[in-house]
Regions:
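Acidic/polar low-complexity segments and flexible, solvent-exposed patches
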Residues: 1-18, 24-335
């Protein structure tokens, strides 16, 4: 029998070892598969746990954020309400502007209705102390001025505006109310004034103020007398050759009832008499021959009632009928 070749021996040797190797491999496969399955399950469980945890935290964060947002909104709303409340109770520091709406006469007092505005004041109160409130005419001359105090009785604003009535007593205004052209006036509001005495009494709803300095009142009265002479000139001319009555004659520096007359005294008497006799007109005596015909000096003011009579006798009777004394009223006929 021929000897086996080396190839055949190798094949026989390999054939004898394959069953052991295969058996080993077959035993390992289930173990490997089981390990893989276990790892996969563990991985799935881990992923699930992570996912669950993430979603839970996200939900908590969302809830927390939502709660925080709502809380912030509530805090902001409360803060806004507190600020609004503070604005309502806080006093305004802005000095308001003023405009004259109307004037009227109440006895010898002039009542001015004034519109004040200060946008910054909103709905707050203004407590200005010692405030000069002046009215000026179209040529910027002061025709009324007094010192008012809003510290104890504040000016209450609504949406930045307020309307008040102010009382100007004689000595605080220098033009008759019916001769003031409201639309051509301007007003000045100034704090830090020095009141000249106590405030005059209020008249109804119109609050009274204190006088301004005597020197200022004297200057305004002198200017007012000059304005009145010019204003009344044509009305005086209308009385030429017509009997009328003279209610006073006044000269600066003259003594009347123990008092030296100053311009503000003369103008005060003019306003007092005109309040009762609205036709009254002021004249400068030196401008009319009736007062200069005998060569006398006539450098003084005269106030005519403006009433017209049929005779000088009727004019004299009018004086006595209206309670004037012999030295307070006289019949005149200007020419």
């Amino acid at each position: 029998m021929p000897a086996p070749s080396s190839l055949q021996l190798d094949m026989q040797s390999g054939t004898q070892s394959d069953p052991q190797a295969n058996d080993c491999k077959n035993r390992k496969k289930p173990i490997i598969i089981a390990i893989i399955v276990i790892i996969a399950v563990i991985a799935l469980i881990a992923r699930f746990v992570v996912w669950k945890s993430t979603n839970h935290n996200s939900g908590d964060d969302s809830a927390q954020n939502g709660s925080s947002t709502a809380q912030n909104a509530d805090e902001q709303s409360n803060k806004t309400k507190q600020n609004d409340a503070a604005k309502q109770t806080k006093d305004c520091a802005t000095t308001p502007d003023a405009g004259l709406e109307s004037v009227e006469k109440n006895g010898t007092t002039m009542i001015a209705t004034v519109a004040f505005s200060a946008h910054a004041c909103g709905d707050t109160a203004w407590k200005g102390e010692d405030v000069t409130i002046s009215i000026k005419d179209s040529i910027n001359e002061v025709i009324a001025s007094a010192v008012y105090d809003f510290a104890s009785d504040p000016m209450q604003f609504t949406s930045g505006t307020a309307t008040l009535e102010l009382a100007y007593a004689i000595g605080q205004y220098w033009r008759a109310s019916d001769q003031i052209e409201t639309k051509s006036t301007s007003m000045v509001v100034q704090k830090g004034a020095t009141p000249n005495g106590n405030a005059v009494a209020s008249v109804g709803d119109a609050r009274g103020g204190a006088n301004i300095a005597d020197s200022d009142a004297e200057r305004y009265a002198q200017l007012a007398l000059s304005w009145q002479l010019s204003h009344d000139r044509s009305a005086v001319s209308g009385l030429y050759d017509i009997p009328t009555t003279q209610l006073f004659s006044r000269k600066y520096g003259m003594e009347v009832d123990g008092k030296t007359q100053q311009y503000r005294d003369i103008y005060a008497q003019y306003l007092t008499l005109r309040a009762s006799w609205p036709k009254a007109v002021l004249a400068w005596a030196a401008d009319y021959s009736y007062y200069t015909r005998y060569g006398h000096e006539a450098d003084y003011y005269v106030l005519l009632s403006g009433e017209e009579f049929g005779s000088v006798a009727d004019a004299r009777a009018w004086c006595s009928d209206n309670g004037f004394g012999e030295n307070d009223c006289m019949a005149v006929q200007i020419n």
